[in-house]
Amino acid sequence: KVYHFLGKDNIPFHTIFWPGTLIAAKDTFIGKEKVNFVLPHKVIGYEYLNWEGQKFSTSKGVGLFSDEVADLFPIDYWRFYLSSILPDSKDSNFDWSDFQRRINNELIANYGNLFYRVTHFIKSNFDGKVPKGKLDKDGEELYKKLEEAAAKIKKNVGDVHLRTALNNVFAFTSEVNKYFQKKKPWEKKNAYDVGNTI
């Protein structure tokens, strides 16, 4: 399936002219091969993403462009940050201080910390294998939240509400971090119970 992601000013071109061109090109031959082009499954129009309060402009040198970003920070930082500020319902703004804050506080401190805690805990306490066991009450509640979060996130992604999906991922990782804090698996007497939930 083909998805188009574009700014609101390009919606007419991608919903009328481009599909019309593809339909008109039906049964086109390229050399001896007959080709049909795939129509967009969904066109997602966004509001504007601004650069520190200004419109992006290549001619004025306002903004940062895709050929430059990979040299500055890991590409996953960019994916995360841009997904977190997608202008799906109103214009949004790229801001360096917000970029730094979200990377440090959300991606690293929340998600990265959780990933490290879980994998390190499994490696240290269970020889790197996820243990099987019975859930306690807190574990059952967390598992229920996981199922609810997974259903929401699946629907968000299916509806192409990517920022909402990301927000739901991070809401759940916050719940798991709270669970770890409450259970204190670093105290050996709690390791088995927490291992059951993992």
Language-model regions: role of each:
Residues 98-135, 142-198:
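Helix-rich, typically C-terminal accessory recognition domains appended to large enzymatic cores
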Residues 47-140:
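Catalytic adenosine-cofactor/nucleotide-binding cores of aminoacyl-tRNA synthetases and other
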Residues 3-16, 105, 109, 195-196:
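Short, conserved micro-motifs enriched in small and acidic residues
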Residues 17-25:
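Alpha-helical support elements that line or immediately flank enzyme active sites
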Residues 3-5, 64-65, 149-151:
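Short hydrophobic "helix-edge" motifs at membrane interfaces and signal-peptide entry regions
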Residues 7, 73-74, 161:
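Glycine-centered helix-coil hinge/cap
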Residues 1-5, 12, 25-41:
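NTP-dependent nucleotidyl-transfer catalytic core
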Residues 20-21, 31-61:
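Active-site and channel-lining beta-strand-loop segments
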